[in-house]
Amino acid sequence: MGSGKTTLARELARALRRPFFDSDQSIRERTGRNGREIAEAEGVEALHRLEADVLHEALGRSTPVVVAAAASVIDDPAVRGALEDTYCVWVTADPEILAERSARGDHRRAVGRTEHLEHRTPLFEQAADLVVDTGNLSESDSMERVLAAIRAP
């Protein structure tokens, strides 16, 4: 939440001429609710299961897509396995920056953000082919970094 992954993924999809898949949007279309509403009504675990389900749906498409997925999906061992066959970019920033940015969005309250980041960082580091820290990068610099890595031999 707040790393800029959706913006970066949308622009990357445009640059690569690939379909863009936003897990938050998919969840809204499927349920009529956003993540905060689902977490409040059904619990955080139900939301995380749904986030993993929509990522599996995106990864199962016949056409390669650029996906903006919730960070919680990395907790699912099946997702980590599926990511082994993809090019995975972990988009992150310092916790303070993430908190400031996500406070402006429609996400659920970020209780335990630091603990989640500490738990998920090694999982993302293992799964990611590229890590982009957007805290000190402009959107265009972040995009250039990803495109350069993808196009490198």
Indicate where each model-derived feature is located.
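The conserved Walker
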Residues: 1
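NTP-dependent small-molecule kinase module
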Residues: 7, 11, 15, 84, ...
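Hydrophobic/aromatic beta-strand patches that form the interior of the parallel beta-sheet core
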Residues: 21, 87-89, 130-132
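ATP-dependent small-molecule kinase phosphotransfer cores
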Residues: 22-82
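Structural motif corresponding to alpha-helix initiation and N-cap regions
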Residues: 52, 76-77, 114-118, 140
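Short glycine-rich anion-binding loops that position phosphate/pyrophosphate groups of nucleotides
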Residues: 70-74, 94-96, 137
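A glycine- and Lys/Arg-enriched "phosphate-lid" helix/loop adjacent to the NTP-binding pocket
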Residues: 85-123
